[in-house]
Amino acid sequence: MIYKIINFILSKKDHEEKKDLLLKIMKFFNKTPLNFLIKNKFPNNNISCMGLNFKNILGLAAGLDKNGDYIKLFSDIGFGFIELGTVTLKPQHGEKKPRLFCFPNVYGIINRMGFNNNGIENLIENIKNEKNVKSILGINIGKNKDTLIEKAKDDYLICINKAYYYSDYISINISSPNTKDLRKLQFGELFSDLLKSIKEEQNKLNKIYNKYVPILIKISPDINNSEIIQISDCLLSYNIDGVIATNTTVNKDIIMRCCNNCEKGGLSGAPLNENSTRIIKKLSKELKGKIPIIGSGGIISVKSAKEKIKAGASLIQIYSGLVFFGLKIIKKLIKSF
């Protein structure tokens, strides 16, 4: 109810401004005696995946809490895991506003945020300052806009080094459509070299901290079956711990079919569901259960969530579903598994 009231009050705001204000207001309420309006308590399902113990199957996808400003809030409202970021080595402003567009008639969102964030150091400080967080914390990392694609590996390795001790898992974002050439890192020598270097860094940090932090790769939905096979082979070859499927789509057919006023950027939400589920199904076939899949992209109902699990996902994440349906979707999804 409180989500609906605040959402209505802010209905005339720019979508990004509305989102930010909504989160700030909810964070404030969560620190008052009225926090019972926000907090959710669910029985722990104790799902084991990647050597981690998740209290439930549902996670928050990267993008909603880029800087770790709302960790306690998202933990208290029930998420089993929270993926922070995408964060980059250096702070950056991202693309010019407006850059976030909602299409409620199809439950779709187009964004061209461009990895706006306050940098990895700021995120780590925010994590250090949090207390009594009962959700698994993931950190999603990307490269800075001004880092050449040939040098992108260095950004990822430095960020892994900084994030390792403070995260339960790390995800590597090489699939956002809003950073030039980023998706090239999913293929060929750039991909294999990145994975090799990541595993070497992970092994080194494991010895230093005596702590194994799983590393996952987040992939694009705009890939064909041949590319899925190539990506899967590489993930298996380098013993990558997990894969997140998928990021947003730039498939013009899907976008034009759903959003007549076509904005530049990546499309998420319900229009992405069918394609992301297709990717998960094919990935699952190729990975043969050796690498877990986190299903993300278009989950706006129990039905779409169960489709992801049936296709082969071990865990699921939402973003657009939360934007359109508020806290009630968290309850529905968690109670359904």
Curated annotation (Swiss-Prot):
The listed locations are: Cell membrane
Q: Any idea which UniProt keywords this protein has?
A: Cell membrane, Flavoprotein, FMN, Membrane, Oxidoreductase, Pyrimidine biosynthesis
Q: Provide the GO biological process annotations.
A: 'de novo' pyrimidine nucleobase biosynthetic process; 'de novo' UMP biosynthetic process
Question: Which Gene3D superfamilies does the UniProt entry name for this protein?
Answer: Aldolase class I
Q: Which residues bind substrate?
A: 66, 111-115, 173, 178, 247-248
A GO cellular component annotation in the UniProt record: cytoplasm
Per the entry, what this protein does is: Catalyzes the conversion of dihydroorotate to orotate with quinone as electron acceptor.
The protein depicted here goes by the name Dihydroorotate dehydrogenase (quinone)
| Source organism of this protein record | Wigglesworthia glossinidia brevipalpis
Q: Which gene encodes it?
A: pyrD
